Amino acid sequence: MNYIVLGRFQPLHNGHVFLIEKALDLAGDDDKVIVAIGSASCQIEPRNPWTGEERKEMIENWNNQVEVVLIDDINDPPNWVEHAKKSHGNGILVTSDKQTAELYRESNWNVIEVDLSNRENFEGWRIRQTAKMLSTVDDFDAVREVLSSSLPSSVIEWLIEKDALFRLSTFQTGVYAG
C-alpha cells in the first residue's frame, strides 16, 4: 500500500515533516510513502520561489526513506486527482488540508486526515515571509536560530548552502498568502 502526502512544499517545513512522519508510521516496514510535489513546473515567483527539482532535493536531503514525485499543475480541480494519480499512483492520501481531503474523497479515495496543532505557524506563506526578511542577512547562525522553529535543520542548511534564501529578496512584491 502507498501512503501519499501531497503539497507544494515551498519549502518543506515542520508541519509537512509531522505529516510525512505520520504517513511513515502508518506505512510501517511493509508499505511505501510517496511525497507528491504539486505545482512542480510553475514559474518561479513569490508564491512558488523554488523549482520542483529544488523542492525534491530539499525533501530527499531531509529523508531518503520516501519516494518523491513531481506533479505539474493543470489548474483544473475536477480533473486534478486523476491527473495527480498518474504521478503518485494509487494509495491512501494522508493530509491535514480539508479541501484536498474533500477533493480526493469525491474521487473515491481513502483519506486519513491528520490534525496539526499550531497549524497557523506552519503555513508556507508565513515561513516564506520570514525567510524573505532573512534573505539578505549574512549571519547564518541568526538565520538558523530564527528558522529552526519552522524548518528542519537539513532544509535550513540546504537553503544556506544553495544561496536559495537570497532569491526571495529579488521579488518586487511580498510573498503571497495561500
Set out the residue ranges of the language-model regions.
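Nucleotidyltransferase catalytic core that binds NTPs
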Residues: 1-178
